């Protein structure tokens, strides 16, 4: 059998009964919030200072919304840990699909994450694409659909992740002699569009590892060069939670501490490797006003091209 889409054991992962429940190992507390903010350089006071949170119109401190994923990550576990995603990975590895990379990441934030909350994440696999040839490798896209709730049953948020499972070494190598693409024509922006000041951040090995640890992500290829090389990557690379954590910081640095992020839709492209520089730029459809929904279009680039493109919604 050469097509994983015809394997009954793999098809079983896409049935209504195939659900993974991931519970946070501990209540939400100040320390992981502080570690996340340090890793992403997010100095927004509403995440750690109760007086500041109330001064800016919030009822209390709350965790950065993107942490809803981090709090329910399995953390550093034995490789044989019984997790639905681990089972799927092992089955796909039988077909040579033993490398993964995130293609798209969408989050909707509904209820603030408070100190003391215990979060639970419900994970389902949506579907499996036909085989695709991408720049990084040949494989299949599999979306994961997830809901996060707190101990009271309140929905904290929803997220959807599109993951590429691919065969390492099957991508299209970059041609160093290739001519750079022609610059796109100048964008015509509607009246009232606000341009955000650029933000450039050096990419170091320490930063990439710190972000992965702060987001409770112990995928080896974010910390271990040998594991990254085995995946077909030139070095360790930044995980999606860190990338989106920086994007969220960029949005609220501009909008200010009164802003609340309600969600984002992000497409991931060129990886962030150590020794490079990432630069955020963006535009808003209008100046931010507290209580009024505003959309921010963000772009992050590095020397390889576009790292991510996002639309963030804030109120």
Regions found by a protein language model. Name each.
Residues 67-68, 106, 160, 210, ...:
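Generic structural signal for residues positioned in beta-strands
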């Amino acid at each position: 059998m050469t097509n994983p889409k015809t394997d009954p054991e793999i098809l079983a992962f896409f049935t209504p009964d195939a659900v993974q429940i991931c519970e946070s190992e501990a209540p939400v507390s100040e320390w992981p919030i502080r570690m996340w903010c340090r890793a992403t350089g997010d100095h927004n006071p509403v995440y750690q200072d109760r007086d500041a949170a109330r001064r800016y119109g919030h009822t209390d401190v709350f965790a950065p919304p993107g942490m809803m994923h981090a709090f329910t990550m399995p953390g550093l576990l034995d490789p044989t840990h019984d997790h639905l995603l681990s089972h799927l990975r092992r089955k796909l590895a039988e077909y040579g699909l033993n490398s993964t990379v995130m293609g798209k990441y969408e989050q909707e934030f509904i209820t603030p994450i408070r100190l003391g909350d215990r979060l639970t994440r419900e994970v389902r696999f949506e579907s499996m694409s036909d085989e695709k040839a991408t720049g990084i490798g040949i494989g299949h896209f599999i979306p994961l659909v997830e809901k996060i709730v707190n101990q009271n049953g309140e929905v904290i948020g929803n997220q959807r992740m599109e993951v590429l499972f691919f065969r390492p070494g099957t991508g299209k190598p970059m041609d160093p002699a290739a001519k750079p693409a022609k610059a796109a024509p100048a964008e015509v922006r509607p009246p009232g569009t606000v341009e955000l000041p650029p933000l450039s951040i050096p990419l170091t090995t320490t930063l990439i590892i710190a972000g992965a640890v702060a987001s409770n992500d112990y995928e080896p290829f974010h910390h271990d060069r040998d594991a990254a090389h085995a995946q077909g990557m030139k070095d360790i690379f930044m995980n999606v939670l860190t990338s989106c954590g920086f994007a969220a910081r960029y949005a609220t640095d501009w909008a200010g501490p009164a802003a609340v992020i309600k969600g984002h839709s992000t497409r991931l492209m060129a990886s962030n490797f150590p020794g490079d520089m990432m630069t955020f730029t963006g535009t808003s459809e209008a100046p931010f006003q507290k209580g009024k929904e505003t959309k921010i279009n963000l772009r992050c680039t590095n020397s390889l091209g576009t790292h991510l493109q996002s639309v963030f919604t804030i109120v």
